[in-house]
């Protein structure tokens, strides 16, 4: 549903990203030979970027896109979701045409008939073969199949048919290799902010030869300044404007994190900028305090202290005990781990502020 005719006092902005858009377009313009991992810190704009580039690509060439946003979908499932839950989100029962698969797949799922559905759940039909047939059919029609999975790590603990011998994620990777490197049938794009999950893939010798990694980072300063000094153009904000010093203050507080900038702009409808930023910094400090106060407090403080005067912590500077603590910080989105650099970073400027303020107490 389009919302272009609805008036809002602030809209979500999309700023530049031309380099990233060009990279993704070039990926889809070449014959599929590798599957692509989009990685980067939380809220760096990976999902928004994918939606944007897909809209542009669909206007220029024939594509058939399946976009599985697992972060969104699995909120509907219980914590102990299993293989059958995955099948339910992957396949939809569509029109039946003489017992064969229909080809109208435009909503992010693969449509199948009831007979195929029954055989899949009985284990008599390999679901990956069903998807492969659909890719072949599209390929023969001159249509490019594009499969995008956002936050793939949500499937990391699922086993096939509830057994403990075949992990679903491994079978998916084998399928991705077959569809790209071996058969050149489809484009596979995986987006994730879980650096540890991606590190497993990045250091797997087999998968490393079949995949590409591309980092989507926060916006650079010049793009943030362009946005904040032209709020009506990019965010449709008419209620207030920002001066260059105002924009500098926002940059120094949250950097290029678009989600956090949007949040600050929303708060400014009711409060002056300095008050908004002061409250924001206090909030970030309180998040660090809430995380640190636990039995391992002294050990956590020792690790976080690394970031008071520096931006990164290389993996070679830590030991196995440190790694366990840092792993939890990554999962709680306090720290970001970059698998391509083997280094830890605060989860953006705002968390960096929170860490520094914590040690100023």
Model regions: which residues?
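Conserved Walker B catalytic segment
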Residues: 120-206, 211, 324
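Short, conserved phosphate/pyrophosphate- and ester-handling motifs at nucleotide-, phospho-/glycolipid
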Residues: 17, 47, 257, 348
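Structured catalytic cores of enzymes that bind and process phosphorylated ligands/cofactors
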Residues: 38, 47-50, 64-67, 165-169, ...
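A short, basic N-terminal segment
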Residues: 1-41, 55-61, 70-73, 196, ...
């Amino acid at each position: 549903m389009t919302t272009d005719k609805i008036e809002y006092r602030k809209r979500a902005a999309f700023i530049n990203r031309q380099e990233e858009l060009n990279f993704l377009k070039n990926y889809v313009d070449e014959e599929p030979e590798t599957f692509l991992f989009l990685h980067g810190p939380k809220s760096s704009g990976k999902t928004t970027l994918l939606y944007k580039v897909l809209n542009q690509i669909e206007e220029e060439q024939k594509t058939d896109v399946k976009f599985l946003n697992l972060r969104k979908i699995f909120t509907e499932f219980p914590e102990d979701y299993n293989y059958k839950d995955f099948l339910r989100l992957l396949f939809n029962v569509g029109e039946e045409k003489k017992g064969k698969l229909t080809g109208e797949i435009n909503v992010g799922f693969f449509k199948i008939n009831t007979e195929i559905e029954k055989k899949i759940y009985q284990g008599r039909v390999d679901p990956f073969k069903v998807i492969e047939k659909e890719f072949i059919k599209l390929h023969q029609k001159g249509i490019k199949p594009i499969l995008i999975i956002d936050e793939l790590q949500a499937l990391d603990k699922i086993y096939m048919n509830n057994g403990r011998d075949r992990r679903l994620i491994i079978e998916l990777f084998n399928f991705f290799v077959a569809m790209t490197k071996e058969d050149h049938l489809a484009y596979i794009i995986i987006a994730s902010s879980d650096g540890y999950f991606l590190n497993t893939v990045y250091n797997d010798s087999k998968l490393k030869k079949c995949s590409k990694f591309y980092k989507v980072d926060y916006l650079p300063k010049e793009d943030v300044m362009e946005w904040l000094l032209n709020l009506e153009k990019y965010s449709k904000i008419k209620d207030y404007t920002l001066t260059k010093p105002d924009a500098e203050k926002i940059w120094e507080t949250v950097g290029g994190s678009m989600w956090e900038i949007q949040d600050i702009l929303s708060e400014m409808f009711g409060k002056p900028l300095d008050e908004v930023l002061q409250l924001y910094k206090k909030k970030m400090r309180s998040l660090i305090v809430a995380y640190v106060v636990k039995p391992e407090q002294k050990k956590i403080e020792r690790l976080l202290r690394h970031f008071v005067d520096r931006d990164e912590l290389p993996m070679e500077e830590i030991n196995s005990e440190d790694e366990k603590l840092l792993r939890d910080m990554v999962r709680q989105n306090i720290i970001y781990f970059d698998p391509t650099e083997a280094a830890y970073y605060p989860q953006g400027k705002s968390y960096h502020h929170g860490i520094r303020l914590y040690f100023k107490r």
